[in-house]
UniProtKB/Swiss-Prot annotation:
PROSITE patterns: DNA_MISMATCH_REPAIR_1 (PS00058). Keywords: DNA damage, DNA repair. This is DNA mismatch repair protein MutL. GO terms for cellular component: mismatch repair complex. The gene is mutL. The keyword DNA damage applies. The keyword rRNA-binding does not apply. Residues 387-396 have a biased composition (Low complexity). The lineage of its organism: Bacteria, Bacillati, Bacillota, Bacilli, Bacillales.
Length: 647
């Protein structure tokens, strides 16, 4: 008898579940996407113990016909594609036919569904085996409950994280879906506590306000562009609103949230020199294109895609963002205190894929274990020792409450997140309607950011503080200017132009400068000698592992020539292959910093006036090349309020 055998369907589904159903968040993602594909306009998501105990999804979509219910749980059974041509024209979120059988194979699942023109179907499946199938009275749509996830795969269950982490993963997914489909009303509950409610009115800015806060929504810049192949719409924050992680950038392709590093990189490039190192914007970009231009069949989770015209898309994103910022005066308002900004950022840190932290008023709420101060960050020791969820030991019983629509489900009393049990609010709750109406009004009242050019307004100097900061004024109020950052921007644009020129005016060194390298570094540099001449490095071989420099461009900062050569060489030997564009950029930034006024350097009034006038001639007078702000603004109103002239 041969050793190779065909696996049965149940074992195949268990193997597939290892890729498709990684954690509770995977289940939520797949089921909610199915609801959206079924033309749902409202979706409820109910969780217990971060989905490890129970996940319930209720929608008002098309429902599943009785004859399709069993087939839907067979592997590679789908209504979304018919032949290989459909695979290259996919508009739906799902298409592989793997999610439902994979989820059913590692859980205890109950399905109640109806198409609205016939009796509904009630189906119970445990570990991939059908336990019960019957007709039932049901409204149009689908109500699916997944309980005791991974009950038959203890190895997978063992590696589930804490309640907070798993809940954070789920909220991350739901937030992205809410942004992708603002036309769908989404409601997320955890142990009967509401975490998110979107109106479904199609206004993505309102969804962003629900997730990030109304304060962030006020700092959003609308982005819109179109080419022959792509249409881009979305919002990105002003450079003054940043976070320490890329997790706040969301990219949507044909209605599907995707994780694509090059798209995020393109967004960052659109902010070129506007962001400090290690800081990232909050952004949402929705990209529409012909399905033939994108391959979504890359990974079972469908989070990764490949583009056939990637470079054209990246260029369009970069140019669109850069064009938008050129229309705006990017002067940060000093009216928001540091404490307020720190608080707001601590709120936004909840939106990280691996962490879920306590709630601030503007964010969906996640309740801490009893006894923990809500205003304190969860200590690392607490995170590491947090109790892991344990599956219930009693025999599973299908909840009868799911059979009849009018009966409400009861939350588990064994949650490690202790909270009082409260009655679940109905969809027509007056309180919820009021909250959404209030948010809608706030979003509508947001003043659009003025796009009347980014020219720096005339500034009239009135003094200098500590030899570092310049004070100036105009009819808009008071401005504080960092003199080093201001001249750094001026010098950067000068050196950027010089480094980019092919023909270099050179000056001989009195004494040739010798550079000693290791053999590996020497060989790496030797390959790039012609390229390095383009950035002003004129190297001649001197011995087996050395180079000498006899001349340098005339525009090198005086007295710092050898130091600049050393730093440029350091950049070169770090790289396996020299990126001339990047090296030019780094060289211009480095030289602009070294050639600029330093702190504690006092200037005359004429020097200050000349500096401000020269700053106005730059293409971006608002940030230094490292992304730090050059000036901040105190409006006259803020000053009057500070001195209690207005209340």
């Amino acid at each position: 008898m041969g050793k190779i055998r065909k696996l049965d369907d149940q074992l195949s589904n268990l193997i597939a579940a290892g890729e498709v159903v990684e954690r509770p968040a995977s289940v939520v993602k797949e089921l909610v996407e199915n609801s959206i594909d079924a033309n749902s306009t409202s979706i409820e998501i109910h969780l217990e113990e971060a989905g490890l105990s129970k996940i319930r999804i209720i929608d008002n979509g098309d429902g599943i016909a009785e004859e399709d219910c069993i087939v839907a749980f067979e592997r590679h059974a789908t209504s979304k594609i018919k032949d290989e041509n459909d695979l290259f024209r996919i508009r739906t979120l799902g298409f592989r036919g793997e999610a439902l059988p994979s989820i059913a194979s590692v859980s205890e699942l109950e399905l109640i569904t109806s198409t609205g023109d016939a009796p509904g179907t009630h189906l119970i499946i445990k570990g991939g085996d059908i336990i019960k199938q019957e007709k039932t009275a049901s409204r149009k749509g689908t109500d699916i409950t997944v309980q005791n996830l991974f009950f038959n795969t203890p190895a997978r269950l063992k590696y589930m994280k804490t309640i907070h982490t798993e809940l954070g993963n789920i909220t991350d997914i739901v937030y992205r879906i809410a942004m992708s489909h603002p036309e769908v009303s989404l409601k997320l509950f955890h142990n009967e506590k509401k975490l998110l409610h979107t109106s479904g009115n199609g206004d993505v800015r309102q969804v962003l306000a629900s997730i990030y806060s109304i304060q962030v929504a006020k700092k959003l810049v609308p982005i819109e562009a179109e080419s022959l192949d792509f249409t881009i719409k979305g919002y990105v924050t002003l450079p003054e609103v940043t976070r320490a992680s890329r997790n706040y950038m969301s990219t949507i392709v044909n209605g599907r949230y995707v994780r694509n590093f090059v798209l995020m990189k393109a967004i960052q490039q659109g902010y070129h020199t506007l962001l400090p190192v290690g800081r990232y914007p909050i952004g949402f970009l929705s990209i529409e294109m012909d399905p033939m231009l994108v391959d979504v069949n890359v990974h079972p989770a469908k989070l990764e895609v490949r583009f056939s015209k990637e470079q054209e898309l990246l260029k369009l994103i970069e140019e669109t963002l850069q064009a938008a910022f050129k229309k705006i005066q990017l002067i940060p308002d000093a009216g928001v205190t540091t404490k307020k900004k720190e608080k707001d950022e601590s709120v936004q840190e909840q939106f990280q894929f691996e962490h879920a932290k306590p709630k601030e008023p503007s964010m969906p709420e996640i309740v801490l274990p009893t006894g923990m101060d809500e205003k304190q960050e969860e200590p690392q020791a607490v995170k590491q020792s947090a109790q892991l969820w344990q599956p219930p030991k009693q025999e599973w019983q299908p909840p009868q409450s799911l059979v009849r629509e009018e009966q409400s489900w009861q939350p588990s009393t064994k949650s490690i997140i202790e909270e009082p049990i409260r009655e679940e609010k109905s969809w027509n709750s007056n309180d919820e309607d009021f909250e959404l109406e209030e948010l809608e009004e706030e979003v509508q009242e947001i003043e659009e950011i003025e796009m009347n050019g980014n020219d720096l307004p005339p500034l009239y100097p009135i003094g200098q503080m500590h030899g570092t900061y310049i004070f100036a004024q105009n009819d808009k109020g008071l401005y504080m200017i960092d003199q080093h950052a201001a001249q750094e921007r001026i010098n950067y644009e000068y050196f950027r132009d010089k480094v980019g020129r092919v023909a270099q005016e050179v000056q001989e060194l009195l004494v040739p400068y010798r550079i000693d390298l290791s053999l590996t570094e020497f060989l790496r540099v030797e390959e790039q000698l012609e390229e390095l001449k383009k950035v002003g490095l004129f190297l001649e071989q001197f011995g087996h592992q050395s180079f000498i420099v006899r001349s340098h461009p005339t525009w090198f900062p005086k007295g710092q020539e050898t130091e600049i050569i050393d730093e440029m060489m350091e950049q070169v030997v770090k790289l396996k292959k020299v990126d001339i564009k990047k090296l030019r950029e780094e060289a211009a930034i480095m030289m602009s910093c070294k050639a600029s006024i330093k702190a504690n350097q006092y200037l005359t009034n004429d020097q200050i006036f000349a500096l401000l006038e020269e700053l106005r001639t730059t293409t971006n007078p608002y940030t230094c090349p490292h992304g730090r702000p050059i000036l901040v603004h105190h409006s006259t109103y803020e000053l009057e309020k500070m001195f209690k002239r207005v209340m």
